[in-house]
Amino acid sequence: MNDTLAITYSTPARLSEAEKLARQMKLPLVSLNSTDYSFLLVFTPAHLELRSTGTKAPGPLYVDFLKGATAHRRLFGGGRSQLIVRAVGLKSHPHPTILDLTAGLGRDAFVLANLGCDVLMIERNPVIALLLRDGLERAQSVEWFKSLKLELIEIDAQIYLSTLKKQFDVIYMDPMYPIRKKSALVKKEMRILRRLVGADDDAPQLLALALKKAKHRVVIKRPRLSNPLPGPAPDVVYEGKSSRFDVYLLKPSS
């Protein structure tokens, strides 16, 4: 990480925060216009964002639960008619506990928390976890967000699962998959995330662990045309335009 990432700030008011993070992560503190690193974590007046450097770099990446695409999905995304809602089984269990093993930018977890689920997000990449935590903290400024059951732990998902004592109703995964071919349809944020964190090569191992730990079901989000993860075949598949949800139903313990 040290060869590709540095810390900076766009306003003097956030210099001390930038200095503190640089010390904590043992990363260089550089000027805002630096191009010596692949990525810059930038403290702006509004939020913490991740910028790619270079002439054809996409725009910045940050988490905002109150504005933009995430907020729009909350208001107009289809509510309980969404495929993810059917996949996690909200009709039979209206307020499940959900363990999201691959939190990323927190969008799916946010949708589920808005619908009454108690969601614990796991994110192993420290940079993505920083962006997500920044978004969570800023969203605490509004009352309705404070009422959501949405938490984050920065830890490797395999380590967390292997030591997990509590049983969650649903374990959810949206593993990063390798790029098969270049496409203009690949979103900006996905291109950045793939460059930063790579593919989740341990997804089959996570599935095997999740099947031992979940109470009711395990849900895997996959590209629509991709193969299921190695292991048992899913019991139910909910297919959308570009992605699908493979659902593994678990028998109650006797």
From Swiss-Prot:
Keywords associated with the record: Cytoplasm, Methyltransferase, rRNA processing, S-adenosyl-L-methionine, Transferase
Annotated EC: 2.1.1.242
Keyword Glycosyltransferase: no
InterPro entries in the cross-refs: 16SrRNA_methylTrfase_J, SAM-dependent_MTases_sf
Residues given in the record as S-adenosyl-L-methionine binding sites: R107, D108, E123, R124, D174
Cellular localization per UniProt: Cytoplasm
Any Pfam family the entry gives: SAM_MT
Gene Ontology molecular functions: 16S rRNA (guanine(1516)-N(2))-methyltransferase activity
HAMAP family: 16SrRNA_methyltr_J
Role, per record: Specifically methylates the guanosine in position 1516 of 16S rRNA.
Similarity comment: Belongs to the methyltransferase superfamily. RsmJ family.
Protein's name in the database: Ribosomal RNA small subunit methyltransferase J
Organism, scientific name: Coxiella burnetii (strain RSA 493 / Nine Mile phase I)
Taxonomic lineage: Bacteria, Pseudomonadati, Pseudomonadota, Gammaproteobacteria, Legionellales
Gene: rsmJ
